[in-house]
Regions:
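HIT superfamily nucleotide-processing domains
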Residues: 1-87, 91-132
């Protein structure tokens, strides 16, 4: 796993294809799916058809869980990879009152803020129960 993905996030659970991680940014419920495939895979189309289906199933399951649990205005899903090329998918619960709305989380000039330890641990516990 690219160290930039690992260092800025916390493992929640393993799914059939992907490791599911919480991004350390208190502004949003922000989950990253990191498929356990070769690091040379940088695009979704490079996955096998079966892996593509598994990834779409995981994105759908995660989006649905975040939507029902957090009640956001919108779920943002993206696979950019301009900075970290290893294939990974961002699934972010967004609210009209969040500090970046309506821009993307990358466009807005809002510094990331880490979770307080207690809040982070509690959220990881909730997400593990929700996503296991």
């Amino acid at each position: 796993m690219d160290p930039r993905l690992e260092n800025g996030s916390f493992k929640i659970v393993d799914w059939p294809l992907s490791e599911v991680r919480l991004k350390d940014n208190v502004h949003f419920p922000w989950i990253i799916l990191i498929p356990r495939v070769s690091s040379s895979i940088t695009e979704i189309f490079q996955l096998s058809i079966e892996e593509q289906k598994m990834l779409m199933d995981e994105i759908t399951k995660l989006s649905s869980c975040l939507h029902s649990h957090f009640k956001p205005t919108k779920i943002n899903v993206g696979a950019l990879g301009n900075i970290v090329s290893q294939l990974h998918i961002h699934v972010i619960a967004r609210y009209e009152q969040d500090p970046c709305w309506p821009q993307s989380v990358w466009q807005a000039n809002v510094p990331e803020k880490s979770y307080p330890t207690d809040t982070r641990d509690q959220l990881i516990h909730q997400l593990r129960a929700l996503l296991s």
